[in-house]
Amino acid sequence: MCPYFYWAIPCCCRGTRLGKRIAGINLSKNGSLAIINDGELEFYLEEERLSRIKRDRGAKYLVEKYLDGVDGVAICDCYTKYYPKKFLQRTKEKEAVCKVIRDKKIPILDYRQRHHECHAANARYGSPFDDCAVLVMDGKGSVHDHNGNRFCEIESIFDNENPVFKHYSTFWSEEECKKIEKPYWESMNTELLYSDRTSVGQAYRRVSRECGFDELDAGKTMGLSSYGSGRVDLFNEEYGHSLCSKELYAKEDSTGYYGNQKPVDLAYNLQKSAERHAIYMVAMAINLTNNNNVCVTGGFFLNCVSNYAIIKNVDVNLYVDPLSYDGGLSIGSAFLAYYEHFCN
């Protein structure tokens, strides 16, 4: 059983070849189901369309209705630090989904610890490129334990399917952040950065709360930014990377802001700082892979203004994943399962 989740998925297709129709199911926010048929996307739908619950994290209606004729199911998710009551509720919901799949006697593959890989697969296989770099930036992805500390992936760069850079952070926990004296690098086959800094996705959550919005209403914060002005310093180059300022810090309710800017100016600061950070990251992806074809994905890249800033400032052939938020994980996990268990 995966140590970060308390509901087990029996992976009954390990070492076997699956049929041609593979389903992917996302059980994080924007719960969704996708079907890949012989390497082509055949079907995609989000649970909220059936349940009428905005950003519904489940997939109960989807698995009951749309799994006929499917040869295997890939399950993906995202690590989230729940309060105990909410954790128990979410565990029951996820187990109910898995029970429906088991009752249908469909093999299950566990992709819950491959969050950024699923994002990257969705972008790469949906792009027009045969050879490309893939950049993933979001709030948080899968858990990674290292030197006795627990991190979450927040930025990843892939050379096609091969990881060349990973940024792991403890930002989601005040207790974990205190264990890291300063960001540090390690080099193996992949360049690894460990830090206590906030991800760009989480930065939008915190600033959105500070501006009086729901933490998932980053689009409102982006819109508000057009009315602001002032300094641009929430992402800066230090420790060999572009990192979020400590003005945004780990806090249980995600607000975490030390500064004193007005909401409109704080939104402006974050938007312009995030644009600068995105430009830095795309340039880094090109340098690490020696490839000007770059796919970008992860919830941050719903930021159209930032995407345009990349095009204006970087010599790049840019593909922006249209389903870069977590809903697209179902497509990515289905593609991964298809190419790992059917084509190979």
Which residues are covered by each model-predicted region?
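Short acidic/glycine-rich loops and adjacent helix/strand connectors
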Residues: 2-344
